[in-house]
Amino acid sequence: FTALAPDLYHGKVTTEPDEAGKYMMALEVGRATKDMSGAVDELVRRTGRAKVGAVGFCMGGGLALALAVARPDAVAAVAPFYGVIGWPDAAPDYASMTAAVQGHYAEHDDYAAPPASRALEAQLKDLGKEAEIFIYPGTQHAFFNDTRPEVYDADASRQAWDRIIPFFHEHLDS
């Protein structure tokens, strides 16, 4: 796969969690969606492939879903990790989304709690969308982040990755 990570913060970088939280809260979803859409166009141009996938973690998982709604012409598969669209003014209309969804969520998560992830799965399936949500027992938010040993779960991360690769091959290989 070819990967591209758009700079949604336009050059602002931090390793401090509090500062990162401030950046996240100030992010304009509409602008971020336009930036991601431009990244999709660039991937399509560079690879010559008409279909792309999106992966996002935490807020990025919600943004990956927003991108799939905004770009049904190109986003064929989306894999949010513990991400939901948590912005009241950004409630998506999933009816237009064509992407298959494979979500990966933690059992113990205040941001994307299991009821929210199950509600997302039900909402998508009610609309006839292909959606599968996995909730990893005993895990916490950010279980895939190996730079955070207090929450990282190697077994759950490996299991999630082993699910994502065939999922992307199924939906992105032409």
Which role fits each region the language model picked out?
Residues F1-S174:
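N-terminal cap/leader regions of alpha/beta-hydrolase-fold enzymes
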